[in-house]
Amino acid sequence: MSSNDNSGIVNTCFLTTRLPAWAGVRQDEVGSDVNGLPIIPSNSMQIRSRAATTDAATEPSTRQGLNLLRSVTELNESIDELQQKMTELEKRLKIMEEKIEEIKLALANPLIENPHDGNFIV
């Protein structure tokens, strides 16, 4: 091997980020130098944004699923509550209609006993 032939020699202390892909090392990963200090690859912003995009794509799908389930449950509870209130209002309306009919009959026939106090209405 001659002194000018540098093929196959890695001239760097950043072994984890500078080795070529054919060397079987992971590329573009945060590694550490000989002293244990972190080495950030030159395209670290791309890696971070890609990782953030991946997290943003996976986390919302699970979060959205849970939020959707929670929303459906809350909506069903609200519907049940509204149905109960509607049933109660229908009962009250029926009672009021019956009372209105009684009042109409009482006004049409003045000599009918008043159901509230037992006296005759004249």
Swiss-Prot record:
This entry's Gene Ontology molecular function terms read:
hexon binding
Swiss-Prot/TrEMBL GO biological process terms: symbiont entry into host cell
Its chief place of residence is virion
Superkingdom to which the source organism belongs:
Viruses
Segments forming a coiled coil: 72-106
Its localization reads: Virion; Host nucleus
Q: Which InterPro entries match?
A: Hexon_assoc_IX
Q: Which residues cross the membrane?
A: none
Tell me which GO cellular component terms the UniProt record holds: host cell nucleus; viral capsid, decoration
Disulfide bonding pattern of the chain? none
Q: Name one Pfam family in it.
A: Adeno_PIX
Could you tell me the keywords of this UniProt record? Capsid decoration protein, Capsid protein, Coiled coil, Host nucleus, Host-virus interaction, Virion, Virus entry into host cell
Subunit and partners:
Homotrimer. Interacts with hexon protein; this interaction tethers the hexons together. Self-interacts with adjacent proteins. Interacts with kinesin light chain KLC1; this interaction leads to capsid disruption at the nuclear pore complex during virus entry into host cell.
Q: What is known of its domains?
A: Three N-terminal domains of hexon-interlacing protein form triskelions between hexon capsomers.
* Functional summary from the UniProt entry: Structural component of the virion that acts as a cement protein on the capsid exterior and forms triskelion structures consisting of three molecules that stabilize three hexon trimers at the center of each icosahedral facet and fixes the peripentonal hexons. Dispensable for assembly. During virus entry, recruits the anterograde motor kinesin-1 to the capsid docked at the nuclear pore complex thereby subjecting the docked capsid to a pulling force.
* Family per record: Belongs to the adenoviridae hexon-interlacing protein family.
Additional free-text comment from the UniProt record: This protein is only encoded by mastadenoviruses, and may therefore play a role in mammals tropism.
The molecule here is called Hexon-interlacing protein
| Origin species | Tree shrew adenovirus serotype 1 (TSAdV-1)
